[in-house]
Amino acid sequence: MAIDLLSTFIKPMHREGTKFVAIFAVVTLVLFLIWEPLGWIGVGLTVWCYYFFRDPVRVTPTREGLIVSPADGVVSLIEPAVPPAELGMGPAPMTRVSVFMSVFDCHVNRAPIGGTVTAVAYRPGKFLNASLDKASEDNERNALAIRLADGRQIAVVQIAGLVARRILCEVREGTPLLTGERFGMIRFGSRLDVYLPEGVQPLVCLGQVMTSGETVLADLTSPEARRTGAAR
């Protein structure tokens, strides 16, 4: 019973967080030597750092054609937009769904659908609030193009935010990905944009809470109309 209760709160940690937690822990020990109340503040910050870099197991739906959320967070934008030029996907607008991640969300990023990475392009930029529309164009970003089995393409863009200063991408051109497979993360608050293939409607609405690798964002085979309005 106790083990089950602990497993509810204690999740695996992404390896990217190991050095940060170690630094926080060492600083905490020093703070205890200086003044005990400061040490307890350090304990709280160390626990928060561990929590930020958590990497929980996700149960990804297996039905063919489903596109899942690449990130935990809230849907902040749904609009037509041209995918990043550096991906070479052409000038035609695609439906863009943006998922904003706060500093309290899990920041491990997952592939929205299975396919082969055909392009990876990093572009330096500003660090505006990631919830702003212009963050897609102005902020530091890392863009991926994924070719699906039927030849269509989808784009996924990692966007740095107001606090984030480090985008981690663990795939390169030619890497095969499974739906829900981990491909990177962004530290300390950020955003993920997904560009859907032509004719594919998002099955989410503004303000909807998303779980990476689990929440269905769209369905390549569904005739269902696009949802309107916002989450209530």
From Swiss-Prot:
Metabolic or biological pathway: Phospholipid metabolism; phosphatidylethanolamine biosynthesis; phosphatidylethanolamine from CDP-diacylglycerol: step 2/2
Q: Which GO terms describe its cellular component?
A: plasma membrane
Record-annotated active site: S190
Q: How is the cofactor bound?
A: Binds 1 pyruvoyl group covalently per subunit.
Q: Which UniProt keywords apply?
A: Cell membrane, Decarboxylase, Lipid biosynthesis, Lipid metabolism, Lyase, Membrane, Phospholipid biosynthesis, Phospholipid metabolism, Pyruvate, Zymogen
Topological category with respect to the lipid bilayer: Peripheral membrane protein
Q: Where in the cell is it found?
A: Cell membrane
- What is the predominant subcellular site recorded for this chain? membrane
Question: Which reaction(s) are listed as its catalytic activity?
Answer: a 1,2-diacyl-sn-glycero-3-phospho-L-serine + H(+) = a 1,2-diacyl-sn-glycero-3-phosphoethanolamine + CO2
Q: Where is this site: Cleavage (non-hydrolytic)?
A: G189, S190
PTM annotation, UniProt: Is synthesized initially as an inactive proenzyme. Formation of the active enzyme involves a self-maturation process in which the active site pyruvoyl group is generated from an internal serine residue via an autocatalytic post-translational modification. Two non-identical subunits are generated from the proenzyme in this reaction, and the pyruvate is formed at the N-terminus of the alpha chain, which is derived from the carboxyl end of the proenzyme.
Alphabetically, the GO molecular function entries are: phosphatidylserine decarboxylase activity
Q: What class of enzyme is it?
A: lyase
One GO biological-process annotation of the entry reads:
phosphatidylethanolamine biosynthetic process
Q: What does this gene product do?
A: Catalyzes the formation of phosphatidylethanolamine (PtdEtn) from phosphatidylserine (PtdSer).
| Family, as annotated | Belongs to the phosphatidylserine decarboxylase family. PSD-A subfamily.
The protein here is known as Phosphatidylserine decarboxylase proenzyme
